[in-house]
Amino acid sequence: MSIDNQIQVVLIDDDPHLRQALCQTLDLAGLKVLPLGEATGLTARLSRDWPGVVVSDIRMPGMDGLELLAELHGQDPELPVLLITGHGDVPLAVQAMRAGAYDFLEKPFASDALLDSVRRALALRRLVLDNRSLRLALSDRQQLSTRLVGHSPQMLRLREQIGALAATRADVLILGETGAGK
């Protein structure tokens, strides 16, 4: 079962008390949270265009946070993953950041630090997804311009109309003289 696009934060921590406290902090800030006790199987549940962020403990039984980070970034290298740990040291933080973590928080941390990092990560995620969408639209438009020859005002208008119609599920009937290349 895939994760709903309404979920903004997937929170993974094996400590149920801390998971509940962090979930409550994020809930009170108006964020929709999916709390999980383990990371196994998460990658299969997230689509490449899921609009949220992942907050994960590093040290957990089964799949740890660094393994999860590598797996998630194998599917989508631009997905923000925040790693938290109670056993932080400088080499671990450096390893996490080099692996592509968006942020690294050492427990105990202020709620505001988590909220600030999550909000910045969500803003970045929105920009990344908007950028992908715009690139796809530009690519589609460029493909159309290479297939339709001509630069007259009528051809430009035709390209615009085709672009607008392509986004709908309507049937289209093209009329014209025989041999005109309909």
Residue ranges with predicted function:
Residues 37-38, 64-67:
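Acidic catalytic/metal-coordinating carboxylates
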Residues 10, 49-55:
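Active-site beta3 strand of CheY-like receiver
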Residues 44, 66-78, 95:
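Short amphipathic alpha-helix used as the core "switch/output" element in two-component signaling
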Residues 135-182:
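AAA+ ATPase active-site-proximal loops
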Residues 7, 16-34:
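Two-component/phosphorelay signaling modules centered on CheY-like receiver
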Residues 57, 85:
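Active-site residues of response regulator receiver
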Residues 60:
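Receiver (REC) domain active-site loop signature in two-component systems and cognate sites
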